[in-house]
């Protein structure tokens, strides 16, 4: 197993996965058709109701965990409706409420909610994917966001995408996959002076290298 300098991620993968481009091209030529669970349909109805009651743009915070980042993004974008999505009720229950009133936490599977938003022609202005599970084993490429068949939905949702990780290979892969979708991408090192998430705070405190990929339509 290889350990990249200044990261707690251990992996048997030392560069962009050999199968990445083939896998992304396969997903670009097909439509993800996994049935949507009833609770994700209910989550979508909640989001639609929130959008109807709000006049500002939509910002998504997918895989939001405890929602710390959702609240921080809401304070940074007071005119936007910021929706944090996570499948874990336990993580969402640990959210510490803030004075901002323009954000909501939704329990649901992000991929199914993305698909429903696209089907409803609902666009987002910005989309944050902050420290998702990196699935660092080489055999787990298909479990990463950019290796999942729902990945093309991110482009269809529109807006600027921001992915953060403490594993550079992850953001390099995401950038390469996003370029296949026709997005402009930029990968940079990140200085977390005001951490958005609990993970970011932990990694910064441990002096780990942090990376960000920003992607948007050309």
Regions found by a protein language model. Name each.
Residues 170-177, 181-218:
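Class I S-adenosyl-L-methionine
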Residues 62, 85:
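Conserved beta-strand/loop positions that form the S-adenosyl-L-methionine
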Residues 63-67:
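Class I SAM-dependent methyltransferase "Motif I" SAM/SAH-binding loop
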Residues 1-58, 68-76, 96-121:
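S-adenosyl-L-methionine
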Residues 158-165:
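Conserved beta-strand signature within the Rossmann-like core of class I S-adenosyl-L-methionine
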Residues 142-150:
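Charged helix-capping and loop-helix junction motifs
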Residues 88:
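Conserved SAM/SAH-binding beta-strand->alpha-helix loop
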């Amino acid at each position: 197993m290889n350990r990249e300098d200044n990261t707690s991620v251990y992996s048997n993968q030392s560069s962009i996965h050999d199968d990445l481009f083939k896998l992304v091209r396969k997903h670009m030529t097909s439509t993800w058709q996994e049935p949507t669970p009833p609770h994700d349909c209910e989550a979508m109805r909640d989001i639609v109701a929130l959008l109807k009651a709000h006049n500002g743009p939509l910002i998504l915070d997918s895989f939001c965990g405890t929602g710390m980042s959702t609240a921080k993004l809401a304070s940074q974008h007071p005119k936007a409706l910021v929706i944090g999505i996570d499948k874990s009720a336990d993580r969402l229950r640990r959210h510490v409420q803030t004075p901002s009133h323009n954000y909501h936490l939704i329990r649901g599977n992000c991929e199914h909610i993305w698909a429903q938003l696209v089907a409803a022609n609902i666009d987002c202005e910005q989309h944050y994917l902050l420290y998702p599970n990196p699935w660092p084993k080489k055999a787990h490429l298909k479990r990463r966001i950019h290796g999942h068949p729902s990945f093309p939905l991110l482009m269809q949702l529109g807006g600027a995408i921001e992915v953060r990780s403490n594993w550079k290979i992850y953001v390099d892969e995401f950038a390469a996959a996003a370029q296949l979708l026709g997005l402009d991408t930029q990968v940079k090192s990140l200085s977390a002076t005001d951490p958005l998430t609990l993970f970011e705070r932990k990694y910064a405190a441990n002096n780990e290298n942090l990376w960000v990929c920003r992607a948007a339509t050309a």
